[in-house]
Design a protein with these regions (language model features):
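Glycine-centered, phosphate/nucleic-acid-interacting loop/turn motifs that mediate DNA/RNA or nucleotide
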Residues: 289, 296, 491
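Conserved nucleotide-binding/hydrolysis micro-motifs of P-loop NTPases
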Residues: 9-12, 29-34, 79-83, 111-116, ...
Length: 819
């Protein structure tokens, strides 16, 4: 028997259909052996030995069971460092279990799930590439050292910053530097000219102003309407003639096939897909499962290469010649230069597995989004070996006594690669110009002026940030999406309208790291580590020396930072926070200074006269992207007067967000939080009175006869019934009625009901299937102990037989450990 191991079940299913019955194909489902979840787990000595690798037995047991019945084991994990590491781990586990004798373990790789590629790979196996393994282990160890040494001190010195990462933190720094540019941006007014001239045939020609009195015109130089009107009058009264005519052929070269980063960027700009979604779709197209029997449609997608195999290039050129036309094939084979000098060996571009398989021919077997992505990949691949597009560009320079105008236009003469891949990027959009002669006279037909304002820099989108990371040499294709996910999960960024926006936590964390661990968030240092990993892959650098040097610098830095107090940390952050502390003096008490302060909920701006006994100044406002709430700081916004209490109501903002405040009869302040989804403009006097009157009684539950109330707590609006709480995600806490409240409560009760499975035959004690809280999976409860449920059982009611097996297995394992 022969066993072939891949990473995903979908890929295993597709490959199984290509092989003989003597082959069994199983999936590792990613990594199954890693550093322990808790603790460093690595000996800080010259060997960097691991105390104990943590193994996921659920993943590895079926593979080990099949290995015992197999003579040949083909390790067909992904053709990258991580795939090599998984293959190495499997062999190491087999060595520990003494399963390597009389069995051959062969490493094979293929970039596409094509039958011929798989058969060829099986015929040409290789040994495990220890250099790739060393690079993967080094990356994992670097990440562990960075996280486990810097994260704890980050938590101790900032209170809120619970996570730092080798690639994650420099990435966050990129976003924060862009946000600082935006915060410091000062808007500037300028006026724009829209000039249209007429020739003798009355043709309209749109022009741009180039120079005034032989000085280059700066479009930002018209700072107000008076200046614009004055210039408009001068140009309108001028007579123009054609001073110079420039005609030239312009070519647009085709684009290379996709690497992973280029695919993520293009799918975002052209299809509107997020990088995470694009990778998920590409995985489906690569694995081939669930595609109506089509098999794998594209090659390996987590690649940093844009090159194609020579044999595939020849097929592609023949296809262009036969199906599009001989005159569309490029004169000679186009060889694209790799963007990175450290592209992993064996990697190829993301291309269709079968070039002749046109998107429209298989459209009915794909989902709409699968089709769109395949169509994009197919067109880009076909276009990569086609001729350039050509156009004739014409420039007219039009001169008066004082001004020079320029009119430009172009005419397409040959569509070339754009016949297939014709996505407009705006670069070729231009007017069609009439034929003008030298010294021909033209008159101003229309001249409009328009007020404009300079705009701050755009925030990064996920695709834009990937491009920036690639330019800086930070991260690799397999890590990009994971970086964004982790930053968002840790509340360091928010993603709104496709823009990545640092939160207050993210901004101050970067200031702390940049102030005290500056080398470790330096782009050059991070990129150099990536290069070192690539050099380890090529056997040009010893992996242990990389770890030793990194640890030496890291340990020295940690020792220095440990000596800094929180006060010293805050002082240094204040020095580098001009964009946050634009106001120096407290607007409430007038004699205090504004400073950044730390809390478990995150950083905030407060007054130096603040004291915990509430006798000092209470001014504060949260940090974050919600700059529109800064005006609510201090005294806040006056909403109106409550006719019943005759007290003023103010809308304010503090470190925990927005709230309403009024005074009670005894002079004490009464406050209530504002639901996050409620906009400031919705909060009028009536809404304010209703919010301040919370909690409110809604009525009795018809079955329990117990009171239902509505209120707002630290986690938002909620219903309370029978000492249990139900979150209000969509409903208005001030308006929800009894019928809707009962509906939500009953739904919540039903979703959390325990299921009695039965009694244990030995002890006669009950076995109950319980619902996990806060999105956690279900579990079994028996004899006052909890038992995890296997992944494939989480969505169904468990039988008594299955429950007994889970419980007895866990109890027996514990007994074995005691021995």
């Amino acid at each position: 028997m022969k066993l072939l191991v891949v990473e995903s079940p979908a890929k295993a299913k597709t490959i199984k259909g290509y092989l003989d019955d003597e082959f069994e194909v199983l999936a590792s489902i990613g990594h199954f052996r890693d550093l322990p979840e808790k603790g460093m787990g690595i000996e800080e000595n010259e060997d960097f030995s691991v105390k104990k690798w943590e193994v996921d037995n659920k993943k590895i047991d079926p593979i080990i069971k099949t290995i015992k019945k197999s003579d040949e084991i083909f390790l067909a994990l992904d053709p990258d460092r991580e795939g090599e590491l998984i293959a190495w781990h499997l062999i190491e586990i087999c060595k520990e279990k003494k399963l390597t004798d009389n069995r051959s373990f062969k490493r094979i790789e293929f970039s596409a799930i094509r039958k011929e590629d798989i058969i060829s790979a099986i015929k040409h196996p290789r040994e495990i590439n220890q250099n790739l393994v060393n690079a993967a282990i080094t990356r994992r160890f670097l990440d562990r050292f960075f996280g486990y040494k810097i994260s704890p001190i980050t938590k101790r010195r900032t209170i809120f910053g619970n996570s730092a990462g080798r690639v994650q933190s420099p990435t966050l720094k990129i976003l924060c530097e862009k946000e600082k540019e935006i915060d410091l941006f000062i808007e500037k007014e300028y006026w724009e000219l829209d000039i249209t001239l007429n020739d003798k045939q009355n043709n309209n020609i749109s022009c741009d102003l180039v120079s005034i009195s032989n000085k280059k015109f700066d479009k930002l130089s018209l700072e107000n309407k008076v200046q614009a009107e004055k210039l408009k009058e001068k140009i309108s009264n001028s007579k123009f003639l054609v001073d110079n005519i420039v005609k030239r052929e312009k070519q647009r070269q085709p684009y290379s096939p996709y690497s992973n980063s280029l695919l993520l960027q293009d799918a975002s700009s052209k299809l509107g897909f997020s990088p995470k979604y694009t990778n998920a779709l590409a995985q489906q197209l690569k694995d081939g499962d669930g595609l109506g029997g089509l098999g794998a449609l594209i090659t390996y997608h987590r690649t940093d290469s844009n090159r194609m195999k020579k044999s595939e290039v020849l097929k592609l050129r023949e296809l262009i010649s036969s199906s599009i036309g001989k005159n569309y094939v490029s004169e000679k084979e186009i060889i694209y230069k790799e963007k990175s000098k450290f592209v992993q060996q064996g990697h190829e571009a993301v291309t269709p597995t079968q070039l002749k398989r046109k998107p429209e021919d298989i459209k009915n077997k794909l989902s709409p989004d699968q089709y769109k992505l395949y169509d994009l990949i197919w067109k880009r691949t076909i276009a990569s070996q086609m001729k350039p597009s050509k156009s004739l560009e014409t420039l007219y320079y039009l001169k008066s006594d004082e001004f020079i105008l320029k009119a430009s236009g172009s005419i397409k003469t040959f569509d070339g690669f754009k016949k297939i891949y014709n996505f407009s990027d705006g670069k070729d959009d231009s007017q069609t110009l009439p034929n003008l002669e030298k010294n021909e006279k033209l008159e101003v037909k229309k001249l409009d002026i328009k007020q404009n304002f300079t705009k701050p820099p755009n925030r990064y989108s996920e695709a834009g940030l990937i491009k920036k990371l690639e330019e800086l040499g930070i991260g690799r294709p397999s890590t990009y999406v994971a970086i964004f996910t982790k930053l968002e999960k840790n509340s360091y960024i928010n993603i709104k309208n496709k823009s990545l926006i640092p939160t207050g936590k993210g901004k101050i964390l970067v200031k702390f790291l940049d102030g005290f661990f500056d080398k470790f968030v330096d782009y050059g240092f991070t990129a150099d580590l990536e290069e070192q990993l690539d050099l380890i892959t090529e056997s040009k650098l010893n992996w242990k020396s990389t770890l030793n040097k990194f640890l030496e610098i890291l340990n020295q830095t940690v020792d220095q930072v440990e000596k800094q107090s929180i006060t010293q940390v805050i002082d240094k952050i204040n020095e580098n926070s001009s964009e946050i502390l634009k106001e120096k003096d407290c607007r409430k008490c007038k004699d205090g200074k504004l400073t950044i302060k730390f809390a478990f909920s995150g950083p905030f701006v407060g007054c130096t006269n603040y004291s915990k006994d509430q006798n000092g100044c209470t001014y504060s406002h949260a940090l974050g992207e919600n700059d529109e709430n800064k005006d609510l700081s201090g005294d806040g916004k006056f909403i109106g007067i409550d006719n019943e209490t005759k007290q003023k109501i103010f809308l304010k903002v503090g470190r925990y967000g927005r709230y309403l405040e009024t005074l009670l009869d005894d002079g004490k302040a009464k406050r209530t939080s504002i639901p996050k989804k409620m906009k400031n403009e919705e909060i009028d006097i009536d809404k304010s009175i209703k919010l301040l009157s919370l909690p409110r009684k809604i009525g009795e539950h018809p079955e329990s006869k117990k009171l239902i109330t509505a209120s707002i707590g630290p986690y938002g609006p909620y219903l309370k019934h029978d000492n249990k709480y139900v979150s209000l995600k969509e409903d208005d806490v001030t308006e929800i009625g009894i019928n809707r409240a009962v509906e939500l409560i009953d739904k919540n009760i039903k979703s959390k009901q325990d299921i009695l499975i039965g009694e244990h035959p030995s002890t006669k004690k009950k076995i109950v299937q319980k619902k996990g809280i806060k999105g956690r999976p279900d579990y079994l409860s028996y004899n006052k102990k909890n038992f995890s449920i296997k992944d494939d059982m989480k969505e169904k009611k468990i039988s008594l037989e299955e429950a007994l097996k889970i419980i007895d297995e866990k109890i027996s394992k514990k007994k074995e450990k005691r021995k």
